[in-house]
């Protein structure tokens, strides 16, 4: 791919962005720089420092290779902008160009981390002192200090600016305007060195790499180049690059926005239409179902036989009415809160692919693979190769009972031969940890003190043998924070339990039931029923009931260790049942 080299006047590019001749490809990320970022950019320009290279593409305005969008704010400020079609696309340099556009043309939208538009100024006194670090500042257009600089018609009051020694960046929108204002009002006040700083901005030349018109009909090559150079700054995802590649075949952004708005389960899972991980999952699933590689470098090369309006609509329907319907069913996968308790996103991508390929897949086998993946931490780290391997093996298994996937067989053997343990699982972010809680949620667990009508998403993970109780007894067992000593209960209940002994809070649980009119035996059985949903059987119940403050440190630790052993055995039996 041949690139020509040139230098472009930066303010000329900004002016052409205002006029509509310079635009962005619609796969570019949103403008995300803060006002502090913009201030730092202006300081660099004042000192004529290198701010990086721009990559632009010259395009046929009548037949652009990608969808085009104007620099944010340009349409608001220039109502005639649509009379000119873009001839140049900025492929790399959007944040810098948009930042300078914002500072010089002052559009009325807030920047990142702000709620009001800001105006940018140069403190000329600081330039006199060569204090570049403090020479640029910004004011909210809603603040009193900014409004005090304006005339009644909202133009700047030159006399007030001279008094404050402030120079608005908007005076640089036109070189003739700048020279007229400078020589009429400021040149006699400030030395030539200050003018030279300002002149650095006016004449700043940015190194530019140019893709000529010959690439107008080669968008796929442009996308590949963009992926290669897109290593720093606001990194584009493979999804953004796919949006660019498929511009003429399918409007992915519009399709995703439509799917997000019209499908409640998809909306609940994604959370935000700006989060493009979900539509990327959809595309991965389409590629997987056709036996294609889903590595990002390969996925951006798929063609419209894989991704088109029909295939997109199908994967959206499967996601909403088959996969997410199951994922949100707590009795099936125990995911009480999709943001907190979903073990892996790749498993959902895989499920989409199974439904795409098999229409009605053997869910018994799919579920065996699912739980095996969760409890073997199959998709931690790099995932694409493992997903491709597992999809192939599970698909073969669906059609041939004898071809059991390696991930299922290996976990089964580990558990059966005692080579698998959950004791050291402590990180709430791990799939094993979440998987244990998923199993508990599948049981529809009840809170210890308030067992009736509890929304599962309100339950949080807390210690069964209270950590404070064990520490007060001088016990620093390595399994105190193990998932085997955790279960979901209400925060309110956890605070009431606090540092109490297990015996004491179990007795309180029994009393709560007796206060509802149950006999002693009935109350005990009700508490056993509550605890059963938390993988706490009768033997473990007795351990909890008999672990009180009167026991020695060694006796308490012995009870704790026995409890952990029994609970692990019970949970592993459940896992084995799910995958066998």
Swiss-Prot record:
A Pfam family that the UniProt record links to this protein: GmrSD_N
Superkingdom of this protein's organism: Archaea
InterPro entries: GmrSD_N (IPR004919)
PANTHER family, A to Z: DUF262 DOMAIN-CONTAINING PROTEIN (PTHR37292:SF2), VNG6097C (PTHR37292)
Protein name: Uncharacterized protein MJ0686
């Amino acid at each position: 791919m041949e690139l020509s080299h040139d230098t472009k006047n930066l303010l000329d590019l900004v002016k052409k962005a205002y006029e509509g001749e310079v635009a962005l490809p619609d796969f570019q990320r949103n403008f995300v720089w803060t006002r502090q970022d913009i201030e730092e950019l202006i300081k660099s320009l004042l000192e004529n420092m290198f701010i990086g290279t721009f990559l632009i593409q010259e395009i046929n305005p009548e037949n652009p290779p990608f969808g085009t969008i104007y620099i944010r704010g340009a349409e608001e400020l220039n109502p005639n902008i649509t009379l000119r079609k873009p001839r140049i696309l900025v492929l790399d340099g959007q944040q810098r160009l948009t930042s300078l556009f914002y500072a010089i043309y002052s559009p009325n939208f807030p920047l990142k981390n702000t709620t009001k538009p800001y105006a940018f100024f140069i403190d000329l006194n600081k330039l006199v002192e060569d204090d570049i670090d403090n020479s640029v500042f910004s004011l909210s257009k809603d603040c009193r200090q900014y409004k005090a600089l304006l005339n009644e018609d909202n133009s700047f009051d030159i006399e007030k600016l001279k008094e404050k020694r402030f120079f608005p960046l908007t005076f640089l929108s036109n070189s003739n305007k700048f020279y007229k204002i400078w020589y009429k009002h400021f040149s006699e006040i400030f030395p030539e060195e200050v003018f030279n700083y300002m002149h650095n901005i006016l004449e700043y030349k940015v190194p530019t790499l140019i893709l000529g018109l010959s690439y107008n009909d080669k968008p796929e090559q442009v996308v590949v180049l963009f992926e290669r150079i897109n290593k720093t700054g606001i990194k584009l995802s493979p999804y953004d690059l796919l949006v660019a590649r498929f511009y003429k075949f399918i409007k992915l952004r519009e399709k995703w926005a439509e799917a997000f708005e019209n499908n409640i389960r998809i909306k609940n899972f994604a959370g935000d239409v700006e989060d493009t991980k979900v539509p990327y999952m959809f595309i991965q699933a389409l590629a997987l179902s056709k036996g294609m590689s889903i590595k990002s470098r390969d996925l951006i090369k798929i063609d419209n036989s894989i991704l088109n309006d029909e295939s997109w609509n199908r994967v959206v329907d499967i996601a909403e009415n088959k996969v997410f319907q199951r994922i949100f069913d707590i009795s099936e996968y125990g995911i009480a809160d999709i943001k907190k308790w979903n073990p892996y996103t790749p498993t959902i991508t895989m499920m989409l692919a199974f439904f795409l390929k098999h229409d009605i897949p053997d869910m018994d086998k799919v579920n065996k693979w699912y739980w095996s993946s969760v409890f073997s931490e199959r998709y931690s780290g790099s995932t694409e190769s493992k997903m491709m391997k597992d999809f192939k093996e599970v698909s073969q298994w669906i059609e041939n009972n004898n071809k059991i996937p390696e991930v299922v067989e290996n976990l089964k053997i580990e558990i059966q031969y005692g080579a698998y343990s959950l004791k050291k699982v402590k990180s709430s972010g791990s799939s094993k940890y979440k998987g244990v809680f998923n199993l508990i949620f599948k049981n529809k667990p009840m809170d210890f003190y308030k067992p009736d009508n509890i929304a599962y998403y309100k339950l949080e993970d807390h210690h069964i043998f209270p950590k404070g109780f064990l520490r007060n007894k001088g016990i620093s067992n390595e399994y105190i924070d193990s998932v085997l000593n955790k279960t979901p209960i209400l925060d309110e209940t956890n605070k009431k339990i606090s540092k109490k002994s297990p015996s004491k809070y179990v007795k309180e649980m029994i009393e709560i039931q007796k206060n509802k009119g149950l006999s002693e035996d009935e109350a005990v059985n009700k508490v056993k029923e509550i605890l059963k949903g938390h993988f706490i059987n009768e033997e473990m119940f007795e351990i909890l009931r008999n672990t009180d403050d009167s026991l020695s440190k060694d006796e308490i630790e012995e009870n704790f260790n026995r409890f952990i052993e029994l609970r692990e055995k019970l949970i592993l039996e459940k896992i084995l049942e799910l995958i066998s």
